Protein backbone atom coordinates (compact mmCIF):
# COMPACT_ATOMS: atom_id res chain seq x y z
CA UNK A 1 0.00 0.00 0.00
CA UNK A 2 1.35 3.44 -0.90
CA UNK A 3 0.98 6.53 1.21
CA UNK A 4 1.81 10.19 0.65
CA UNK A 5 3.86 11.75 3.44
CA UNK A 6 4.06 15.55 3.86
CA UNK A 7 7.03 16.72 5.88
CA UNK A 8 9.05 19.88 6.48
CA UNK A 9 11.98 20.16 4.10
CA UNK A 10 15.59 19.89 5.16
CA UNK A 11 18.68 21.36 3.55
CA UNK A 12 19.14 18.01 1.77
CA UNK A 13 15.91 18.48 -0.25
CA UNK A 14 17.06 21.03 -2.85
CA UNK A 15 17.39 18.44 -5.64
CA UNK A 16 14.01 16.87 -4.82
CA UNK A 17 12.30 20.26 -4.84
CA UNK A 18 14.00 21.24 -8.09
CA UNK A 19 12.90 18.09 -9.89
CA UNK A 20 9.26 18.15 -8.80
CA UNK A 21 9.02 21.93 -9.36
CA UNK A 22 10.35 21.82 -12.92
CA UNK A 23 8.21 18.79 -13.79
CA UNK A 24 4.99 20.34 -12.50
CA UNK A 25 5.73 23.72 -14.07
CA UNK A 26 6.25 22.08 -17.47
CA UNK A 27 3.19 19.83 -17.02
CA UNK A 28 1.05 22.87 -16.26
CA UNK A 29 2.36 25.39 -18.79
CA UNK A 30 3.42 23.33 -21.83
CA UNK A 31 1.35 24.65 -24.73
CA UNK A 32 0.75 27.95 -22.94
CA UNK A 33 4.32 29.18 -22.50
CA UNK A 34 6.89 28.81 -25.32
CA UNK A 35 9.02 25.68 -24.84
CA UNK A 36 12.36 27.51 -24.84
CA UNK A 37 10.98 30.01 -22.33
CA UNK A 38 9.75 27.12 -20.13
CA UNK A 39 13.17 25.48 -20.14
CA UNK A 40 14.99 28.77 -19.44
CA UNK A 41 12.57 29.63 -16.62
CA UNK A 42 12.97 26.21 -14.99
CA UNK A 43 16.75 26.31 -15.43
CA UNK A 44 16.90 29.46 -13.28
CA UNK A 45 13.82 29.49 -11.04
CA UNK A 46 13.70 25.78 -10.32
CA UNK A 47 17.43 25.04 -10.19
CA UNK A 48 18.73 23.10 -7.18
CA UNK A 49 20.78 26.18 -6.22
CA UNK A 50 17.60 28.29 -6.14
CA UNK A 51 15.98 25.83 -3.74
CA UNK A 52 19.16 25.60 -1.66
CA UNK A 53 18.88 29.38 -1.20
CA UNK A 54 15.21 29.14 -0.24
CA UNK A 55 15.94 26.34 2.22
CA UNK A 56 18.65 28.48 3.85
CA UNK A 57 16.28 31.46 4.25
CA UNK A 58 14.79 31.46 7.77
CA UNK A 59 11.79 33.42 6.48
CA UNK A 60 10.74 30.61 4.13
CA UNK A 61 8.82 27.47 4.99
CA UNK A 62 8.95 24.51 2.62
CA UNK A 63 7.15 21.18 2.85
CA UNK A 64 7.72 18.18 0.61
CA UNK A 65 5.19 15.49 -0.33
CA UNK A 66 6.75 12.10 -0.93
CA UNK A 67 5.37 8.73 -1.91
CA UNK A 68 6.00 5.95 0.59
CA UNK A 69 7.63 3.50 0.14
CA UNK A 70 10.64 4.98 -1.60
CA UNK A 71 10.20 8.69 -0.76
CA UNK A 72 9.86 9.82 -4.40
CA UNK A 73 8.96 13.54 -4.44
CA UNK A 74 5.44 14.16 -5.80
CA UNK A 75 4.62 17.69 -4.60
CA UNK A 76 5.64 20.56 -2.37
CA UNK A 77 4.73 23.97 -1.07
CA UNK A 78 6.68 27.14 -0.33
CA UNK A 79 5.55 29.92 2.00
CA UNK A 80 6.97 33.21 3.22
CA UNK A 81 6.39 36.92 3.63
CA UNK A 82 4.10 38.36 0.93
CA UNK A 83 5.67 39.79 -2.21
CA UNK A 84 2.53 40.65 -4.15
CA UNK A 85 1.15 43.90 -5.62
CA UNK A 86 -1.67 44.18 -3.07
CA UNK A 87 -1.82 45.82 0.32
CA UNK A 88 -0.31 43.45 2.87
CA UNK A 89 0.51 43.61 6.53
CA UNK A 90 2.21 41.67 9.31
CA UNK A 91 -0.79 39.35 9.63
CA UNK A 92 -0.35 38.06 6.05
CA UNK A 93 1.61 35.12 4.67
CA UNK A 94 2.07 34.15 1.02
CA UNK A 95 1.74 30.63 -0.31
CA UNK A 96 4.28 31.16 -3.08
CA UNK A 97 4.10 27.69 -4.61
CA UNK A 98 1.86 24.69 -4.13
CA UNK A 99 2.79 22.07 -6.74
CA UNK A 100 1.73 18.46 -7.25
CA UNK A 101 2.56 16.16 -10.13
CA UNK A 102 -0.51 15.67 -12.32
CA UNK A 103 -0.61 11.96 -11.52
CA UNK A 104 -1.41 12.96 -7.94
CA UNK A 105 -4.25 15.37 -8.72
CA UNK A 106 -7.60 14.18 -7.45
CA UNK A 107 -6.21 11.94 -4.68
CA UNK A 108 -6.39 14.48 -1.85
CA UNK A 109 -2.80 15.76 -2.02
CA UNK A 110 -3.82 19.33 -2.88
CA UNK A 111 -6.17 19.71 0.09
CA UNK A 112 -3.57 18.13 2.39
CA UNK A 113 -0.87 20.54 1.20
CA UNK A 114 -3.33 23.44 1.57
CA UNK A 115 -4.27 22.38 5.09
CA UNK A 116 -0.56 22.22 5.94
CA UNK A 117 -0.18 25.77 4.58
CA UNK A 118 -3.16 27.00 6.60
CA UNK A 119 -1.92 25.32 9.77
CA UNK A 120 1.57 26.76 9.24
CA UNK A 121 0.22 30.28 8.73
CA UNK A 122 -2.09 30.06 11.72
CA UNK A 123 0.70 28.71 13.94
CA UNK A 124 2.77 31.73 12.89
CA UNK A 125 -0.08 33.99 14.03
CA UNK A 126 -1.16 34.99 10.52
CA UNK A 127 -4.74 35.97 9.76
CA UNK A 128 -4.67 35.87 5.95
CA UNK A 129 -3.09 33.57 3.38
CA UNK A 130 -2.31 35.06 -0.04
CA UNK A 131 -1.29 33.46 -3.32
CA UNK A 132 -1.07 34.24 -7.03
CA UNK A 133 -2.39 31.93 -9.75
CA UNK A 134 -2.44 32.16 -13.54
CA UNK A 135 -5.86 33.55 -14.45
CA UNK A 136 -6.42 30.88 -17.13
CA UNK A 137 -5.43 27.91 -14.98
CA UNK A 138 -9.01 26.74 -14.56
CA UNK A 139 -8.22 23.65 -12.49
CA UNK A 140 -6.14 25.61 -9.97
CA UNK A 141 -8.66 28.44 -9.79
CA UNK A 142 -11.50 25.98 -9.14
CA UNK A 143 -9.42 24.35 -6.39
CA UNK A 144 -8.69 27.69 -4.71
CA UNK A 145 -12.35 28.75 -4.89
CA UNK A 146 -13.33 25.43 -3.31
CA UNK A 147 -10.81 26.11 -0.54
CA UNK A 148 -12.45 29.50 0.14
CA UNK A 149 -10.05 31.93 -1.55
CA UNK A 150 -11.35 35.15 -3.12
CA UNK A 151 -9.69 37.47 -5.62
CA UNK A 152 -8.12 40.63 -4.16
CA UNK A 153 -5.94 41.80 -7.04
CA UNK A 154 -3.92 40.98 -10.14
CA UNK A 155 -0.28 40.89 -11.17
CA UNK A 156 1.78 40.17 -14.27
CA UNK A 157 4.02 37.09 -14.20
CA UNK A 158 6.95 37.27 -16.60
CA UNK A 159 8.23 34.13 -18.36
CA UNK A 160 10.57 34.60 -21.32
CA UNK A 161 9.41 37.56 -23.40
CA UNK A 162 5.76 37.34 -22.35
CA UNK A 163 3.71 38.49 -19.40
CA UNK A 164 0.85 36.36 -18.07
CA UNK A 165 -1.96 37.71 -15.92
CA UNK A 166 -2.19 36.20 -12.47
CA UNK A 167 -4.99 36.65 -9.99
CA UNK A 168 -3.99 37.43 -6.43
CA UNK A 169 -6.22 35.48 -4.06
CA UNK A 170 -6.72 35.65 -0.30
CA UNK A 171 -8.10 33.33 2.34
CA UNK A 172 -9.27 34.75 5.66
CA UNK A 173 -7.81 32.37 8.23
CA UNK A 174 -10.18 33.65 10.90
CA UNK A 175 -13.29 33.03 8.81
CA UNK A 176 -15.26 29.89 8.16
CA UNK A 177 -14.33 26.89 6.06
CA UNK A 178 -10.93 25.32 5.50
CA UNK A 179 -9.11 28.35 6.89
CA UNK A 180 -10.79 27.76 10.24
CA UNK A 181 -9.22 25.42 12.81
Model-derived regions: residue spans:
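Active-site acidic-Proline motif in GNAT/NAT acetyltransferases
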Residues: 101-103, 107, 135-136
Amino acid sequence: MTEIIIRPCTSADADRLSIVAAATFIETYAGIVDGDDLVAHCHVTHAPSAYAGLLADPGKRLFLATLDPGAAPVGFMLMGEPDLPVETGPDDMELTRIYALHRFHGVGLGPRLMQTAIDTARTAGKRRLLLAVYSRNERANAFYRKMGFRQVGTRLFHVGVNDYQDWVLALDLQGTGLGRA
